[in-house]
Amino acid sequence: MLPYDTGKFHGIPVGADSISARHCKMCKYIGGKTMKSSNIPEVKLGIVAVSRDCFPIALSEKRRAAISAACAAKGTDLYECKTTVENEHDMQKAVAEVTAAGCNALTVFLGNFGPETPETLIAKHFDGPCMFVAAAEGDGDMINGRGDAYCGMLNCSYNLGMRHLKGYIPEYPVG
């Protein structure tokens, strides 16, 4: 008799050939004890900042670092991708970086306007859910008076739709 074929499925008597007995083998019912499992996925969240090349990249990087610091202060585990996306090459590098870090969910953060093609292609090339959010323009945190993240969010939304890509955009994505 195999260890998983105990005649009981989580304490309920069953036949040796029943689906429940076979299920015990799959859920690691070993030696009369069930290993605790959960159907809630373990999320390793990453954040990637994007910046249009005609805008100051430092603004996106500074805002991304502030979000990472705020998450760390609240005890939220967040991987901060050091590659800021301005073009398709940067997009591929950033996706490879977050994938190598083990991220399975991603926040694409528009620290300023953002490049529509590379930022939306992140959703295509990253193997996991992507949420798109943007920094508020009126937060006073601008470089040379530039911080057009709201307009970039509108373009991002439009381009995701045009490319038939799925990305999560919260009800209030700018803030």
Residues of each region from the PLM?
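Intrinsic disorder/low-complexity segments
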Residues: T6-G7
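An N-terminal assembly and electron-transfer interface module characteristic of large anaerobic redox
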Residues: S18-G175
